From Swiss-Prot:
Subcellular localization: Nucleus
A Gene Ontology cellular-component term: DNA replication factor A complex
Family: Belongs to the replication factor A protein 1 family.
One of the protein's GO biological processes: telomere maintenance via telomerase
Record gene name: RPA1B
Naturally occurring in which organism (per UniProt): Oryza sativa subsp. japonica
Keyword Acyltransferase: no
Protein name as it appears in the record: Replication protein A 70 kDa DNA-binding subunit B
Induction: Repressed by sucrose starvation.
Residue range(s) of DNA binding per entry: 200-282
Domain of life: Eukaryota
Zinc finger (C4-type) stretch: 496-516
Length: 630
């Protein structure tokens, strides 16, 4: 452009945008030239927003993420002038505010000294909108006092092609997916709302759920969900029912890019939504879905990995977590009977580790157990790395993870975190002794490491508050003595040697495991017991799992059972007595359980350690210093 020319804006452009929220070039109607000034430019997250001014009116405007580099490079500046080549005017937020979303533009002038102000027009004059289709310029209207226009040189008639003719020619030479893209411009996900009609989106499938069946008062059916991500990283959940679910389930593949149109939107149910979007999409059997070949610029699955030693605070909560780790072991497929409908579903447990030197058990369900689980079993000797998105955290066996309907697993992903993990495992992790996070939860929480000296409380702090742990598990550290281990309690249970679940005596001989669906000649014993502990403020009963109980008693449940049977009750009682009146550090969780319609507080030991008197003295000196301000 001529740098000496005085830049101007298009009068009435804001009013035109408000009246024409989504112009469509495929209709053959020329797109008007819209020149606006950038006012009050500022960043919001990864995008930039400003007020677009036509000299008289202003409208709140947002640039897509793909245009953000233009701002950072200085091409687009405050008080600059831009020509809008493609846009959507949408209603956003609870206030139903009109927002201009610019998807394509060119810079007319980087920055002026001041804001452009147009004088008030006479009432009879209408704003001039200059329409500029390619290779032609037509003035639809002009002010009455405007100077005469220069002569217009028309090209030979045979060379003139309408916009619709050009589009039709391009369609004929294009591949199906490209043809769909040319039919209408692609809309960003952020611009969609339930009141829009025709739109096309280009998105990547970043999560794909299982095809599930349901039964309600209206009958039976099937449903599945996908999570879709566009070039700006905006996400939306799409749901398909019955015939649409059967049609699109095999069509949608995780990680691929698609053009989608003829769907509908509604306000998302906040209780069930899985992505940050005010709306959710429904696709029926009339929706159009076509794969887009060779599209790599749309973001892949976005992870928010949590280290294994930082999983503790997520126990029992609704928040799902993403985990990346090295596969250590893979169990055979088990058949589990679901209590709700008595249906048998496949399950497989895998154990993964990361560079926090902790391991965690992850339960794979349904197709993930039989497909990906089998793949992992076949390659477990090579210690593959897996990235899993959307895992539920529970307190089963201390702490464990399990997949849900929308969980996704990528084996040996091409991620920086995977490269770092592989380097760690090959150099030192392979020979490192690792502990299960389920048996040692004193390790961490989000925001920093937690130790046996973090969240230290007296027993009275827990026992004096009957509502503690009512909403979700809370975690504390204790320094207490074991005052009693009742010898007549149920100290252990018979467990399957494969999965550690409870077994029953089989008819004839052996032991039956419902989880493994098999009969074994032998079983093992695993501790499940309670102990009474005391500190200067009181006493309480703590529940123990096998790993912590073995360290406290000093032998396995099988060994203690042998002592009782072969050496008699005196040796058995002596073994338990030797474990009492010894100080221990405990990391515990506090929850509420209901028994006989009465809520009771349950304190469970998550990890245990002997008292390090030097470390304990240092901790006490630090606490004293905090109190005295020294």
């Amino acid at each position: 452009m001529d740098s000496d020319a005085a830049p101007s804006v298009t009068p009435g452009a804001v009013a035109f945008v408000l009246e024409n929220a989504s112009p469509d070039a495929a209709t053959g109607v020329p797109v008007p030239e819209i020149v606006l000034q950038v006012v009050d430019l500022k960043p919001i997250g990864t995008r930039f927003t400003f007020l677009a001014s036509d000299g008289k009116d202003k409208i709140k405007t947002m640039l897509l993420t793909q245009l953000a580099p233009e701002v950072r490079s200085g091409n687009i500046q405050n008080l600059g002038v831009i020509r809008v080549l493609d846009y959507t005017c949408n209603t956003i937020g609870e206030k139903q505010e009109k927002v201009l979303i610019i998807t394509k533009l060119e810079v007319v002038f980087k920055a002026l000294d001041s804001e452009i102000k147009c004088e008030a027009e006479k009432q009879e004059e209408k704003p001039a909108i200059l329409l500029s289709p390619k290779e032609e310029s037509v003035v639809l209207s002009k002010p009455t006092n405007a100077p005469p226009l220069p002569p217009v040189v028309l090209k030979p008639k045979q060379e003139v092609k309408s916009a619709s003719q050009i589009v039709n020619e391009q369609r004929g030479n294009a591949a199906p997916a490209a043809r769909l893209a040319m039919t209408r411009r692609v809309h960003p996900l952020i611009s969609l709302n339930p009141y829009q009609g025709n739109w096309i989106i280009k998105v990547r499938v970043t999560s794909k759920g299982n095809l599930r069946t349901y039964k309600n008062a209206r009958g039976e059916g099937c449903v599945f969900n996908v999570e879709l991500t566009d070039v700006d990283g905006t996400q939306i959940q799409a749901t398909m029912f019955n015939e649409a679910a059967k049609k699109f389930y095999p069509m949608f593949e995780l990680g691929k890019v698609y053009y989608i149109s003829k769907g509908s939107l509604r306000v998302a149910n906040k209780q069930f939504k899985t992505v940050h979007n005010d709306y959710e999409m429904t696709l029926n059997e009339n929706a159009v879905v076509e794969e887009a070949e060779g599209e790599t610029f749309i973001p892949q699955i976005q992870y928010n990995f949590v280290k294994i030693d930082q999983l503790g605070p997520y126990v029992g909560g609704r928040e799902l977590v993403d985990v990346i780790g090295v596969v250590q072991s893979v169990s055979p497929t088990l058949s589990v009977r679901r209590k709700i409908d008595n249906e048998t579903i496949p399950k497989r447990d895998i154990v993964v580790a990361d560079d926090s030197s902790k391991t965690v058990t992850i339960s794979l369900w349904n197709d993930l157990a039989t497909t990906t689980g089998q793949e992992l079993l076949d390659m477990v000797d090579s210690a593959p790395i897996i990235a899993i998105k959307s895992l539920k955290v529970s307190d089963f066996q201390g702490l464990s993870l399990s997949t849900v309907g929308r969980s996704t697993i990528v084996v040996n992903p091409d991620l920086p975190e995977a490269e770092q993990l592989r380097a760690w495992y090959d150099s030192e992790g392979k020979g490192t002794s690792m502990a299960s996070i389920g048996s040692d939860m004193g390790a961490s929480r989000v925001g920093g490491a937690r130790s046996m000296y973090s969240d230290r409380v007296f027993l009275s702090h827990i026992t004096s508050d009957p509502n503690l742990g009512q909403d979700k598990p809370v975690f504390f550290s204790l320094n207490a003595y074991i005052s009693l281990i009742k010898p007549d309690q149920t100290m252990w249970y018979r467990a399957c040697k494969t999965c550690n679940k409870k077994v029953t005596e089989a008819i004839g001989s052996g032991y039956w495991c419902e989880g493994c669906q098999k009969n074994d000649a032998e079983c093992s014993l695993r501790y499940i017991m309670v102990i009474k502990v005391s500190d200067p403020t009181g006493e309480a009963w703590l529940s123990l799992f096998n790993d912590q109980a073995e360290r406290i008693v000093g032998c396995s449940a099988d060994e203690l059972d042998r002592i009782r049977k072969e050496e008699g009750d005196d040796s058995y009682l002596l073994k338990l007595k030797e474990a009492t009146w010894v100080p221990h550090l405990f990391r515990v969780s506090v929850t509420q359980n209901e028994y006989m319609n009465e809520k009771r507080q349950r304190i469970t030991v998550r990890s245990e350690a002997p008292v390090d008197h030097a470390a304990e003295a240092k901790y006490m000196l630090e606490e004293i210093a905090k109190l005295t301000g020294c």
